[in-house]
């Protein structure tokens, strides 16, 4: 095992960002550091603070098309510190990997974006169009005051993004083997099934909501929602939480609470899913309350300049072809896509994200910056 320093500019900036313990929704000066670098190469910096969330909109140029790097400075909590090989906010290089919370998700991407942009502007100071950065500290949290609020601000003044490249860790086994050219929609239900509480020895005086709901839940879990399509897998429904009872063995509960989530394709809409679930509840004659939370619409970036440029960049820098996919969770791309922007996600290998000993290969950081730079050249030269 070797511990070494590294002079790669992307690695050095990543280390500076990791050293700022920006657990969501904190930013801890990460955006200030980025803003200083961007201002030095001609970006107009516009901080946007909404309640406890720090956001930044930075732009170089006044004309279209607008290429936007999007990402987040916040990270998830470090968790059990005793399980980390190194302190999570003390960036450490071991055997060619940089360890620290946020190394892969997504401070490495942020550093690569900055360095790629600096190199591009140095070579092309009079580039056509505009380059922008949309950065938030509210991606890992409730995503209320982050990207969605910035987009609302931009939309209100008719400022449009043409292409957005989100730095989420899209890669699986090696850098660039997968890019995300879309995401499924996400819809969450919070269901309360009502009964009558009572003593288990006197069931005729009570009404057990667990017993009543069981056939519904069985049918819900076995329902086929759609077949998916060439871009999206079939819609998936997963029960995430069930809670009922007082903890005592002799009490029939009065209510049952169930939370379930849909990750849905473009073959259905949220409205169709809601209609089908509520029809199922009615068919089972349940007394219930239900609330729905829209977490994001599905989106897809098909063939076109952004996907072409990204494919070209990955092939040029890595020597292999990428695989566009729509699998996985949601990202802030879901807030950008409804504006009409084309959105892709390209970032490091995601094997250690949200885990103890999160790390990124330092050679991947430099390659990622080169990919980003080639994408800029393909779109704005």
Curated annotation (Swiss-Prot):
Cofactor: Zn(2+); Co(2+)
Gene3D superfamilies referenced in this protein's UniProt entry, alphabetically: Zn peptidases (3.40.630.10)
Swiss-Prot/TrEMBL GO biological process terms: diaminopimelate biosynthetic process; L-arginine biosynthetic process; lysine biosynthetic process via diaminopimelate
Gene Ontology MF term list: acetylornithine deacetylase activity; cobalt ion binding; succinyl-diaminopimelate desuccinylase activity; zinc ion binding
Function according to Swiss-Prot or TrEMBL: Catalyzes the hydrolysis of N-succinyl-L,L-diaminopimelic acid (SDAP), forming succinate and LL-2,6-diaminopimelate (DAP), an intermediate involved in the bacterial biosynthesis of lysine and meso-diaminopimelic acid, an essential component of bacterial cell walls.
First-level EC class: hydrolase
Organism ancestry: Bacteria, Pseudomonadati, Pseudomonadota, Gammaproteobacteria, Alteromonadales
Keywords annotated in UniProt: Amino-acid biosynthesis, Cobalt, Diaminopimelate biosynthesis, Hydrolase, Lysine biosynthesis, Metal-binding, Zinc
CDD domains: M20_DapE_proteobac (cd03891)
Pathway(s) of this molecule: Amino-acid biosynthesis; L-lysine biosynthesis via DAP pathway; LL-2,6-diaminopimelate from (S)-tetrahydrodipicolinate (succinylase route): step 3/3
InterPro entries assigned: ArgE/DapE_CS, Bact_exopeptidase_dim_dom, DapE_proteobac, Peptidase_M20, Peptidase_M20_dimer, Peptidase_M20A
Catalyses which reaction(s): N-succinyl-(2S,6S)-2,6-diaminopimelate + H2O = (2S,6S)-2,6-diaminopimelate + succinate
Active site as annotated: 74, 139 (proton acceptor)
Family that this chain belongs to: Belongs to the peptidase M20A family. DapE subfamily.
Subunit text: Homodimer.
Gene name for this UniProt entry: dapE
Cofactor note: Binds 2 Zn(2+) or Co(2+) ions per subunit.
This protein's name: Succinyl-diaminopimelate desuccinylase
